[in-house]
């Protein structure tokens, strides 16, 4: 119980610190939320969205799952996206993967993990789709590249959702970004697949894949 009690103690200290810095902080926070950003990231405990972006409570709407997937049958994720886009009217959606992702590695190595294997089939599909590129790489670079490809594919998936297609059609200004986080250095990397409408979604996706192929060619 001691470890659990520590969490409560930490919370009390955190709350006290914020109130000392801004006495009206929680009163203002309780009134409403109006975040400009939706973060779709991995569940990995080493990727704390608010801390690594330097944002405060109320500034970042967050959805996390294993390997930061956006799947058209995942009502959990899509409900979050629809609320963020249609109700909160966020301006930016960030899909962020990370190097050293256990989900990506498990999708490649395919160990028997139970139910999670079904979830990881979506990454295995990406692995097979880009096998001609990935198959030529050493293992570490292959996993890093698959992490980046996974982000690009999820940006593409989200952009083709009815939620985003409808938002763009009605002229709503909401941009999708694809990033990768380095646990080894704490830095975010923009994968240059930013989409602001249906046209740029296709263009930036093709551009991102081409960049990865060029990057691989330069490593040969």
Curated annotation (Swiss-Prot):
CDD domains referenced in this protein's UniProt entry, alphabetically: beta_CA_cladeA
Annotated cofactor note: Binds 1 zinc ion per subunit.
Record carries keyword Lyase: yes
GO molecular function, one term: carbonate dehydratase activity
Positions that bind Zn(2+): 42, 44, 98, 101
Entry keywords, A to Z: Lyase, Metal-binding, Zinc
Annotated GO biological process: carbon utilization; protein homotetramerization
EC number(s) stated in the UniProt entry for this protein: 4.2.1.1
Keyword Lyase: yes
Swiss-Prot/TrEMBL cofactor(s): Zn(2+)
One Pfam assignment: Pro_CA
GO cellular component: cytosol
Family: Belongs to the beta-class carbonic anhydrase family.
Subunit-structure text: Homodimer.
Name of the protein this chain belongs to: Carbonic anhydrase 2
Source species of the chain: Escherichia coli (strain K12)
Gene: can
């Amino acid at each position: 119980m001691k470890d659990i009690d520590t969490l409560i103690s930490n919370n009390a200290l955190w709350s006290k610190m914020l109130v000392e810095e801004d006495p009206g902080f929680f009163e203002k926070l309780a009134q409403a939320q109006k975040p400009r950003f939706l973060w779709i990231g991995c569940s990995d405990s080493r990727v704390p969205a608010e801390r690594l972006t330097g944002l405060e409570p109320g500034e970042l709407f967050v959805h996390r799952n294993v390997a930061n997937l956006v799947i058209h049958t995942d009502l959990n994720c899509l409900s979050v996206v629809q609320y963020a886009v249609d109700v909160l009217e966020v301006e930016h959606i960030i899909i962020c993967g990370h190097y050293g992702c256990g989900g990506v590695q498990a999708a490649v190595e395919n160990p028997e993990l139970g139910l999670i294997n079904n979830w990881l089939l979506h990454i295995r599909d990406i692995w097979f789709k880009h096998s001609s590129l990935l198959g030529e790489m050493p293992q570490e670079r292959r996993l890093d590249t698959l992490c980046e490809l996974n982000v690009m594919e999820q940006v593409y998936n989200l952009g083709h959702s009815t939620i985003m297609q409808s938002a763009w059609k009605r002229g709503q200004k909401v941009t999708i970004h694809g990033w990768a986080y380095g646990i080894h250095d704490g830095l975010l990397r923009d994968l240059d697949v930013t989409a602001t409408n249906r046209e740029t979604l296709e263009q930036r996706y093709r551009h991102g894949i081409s960049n990865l192929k060029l990057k691989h060619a330069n490593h040969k």
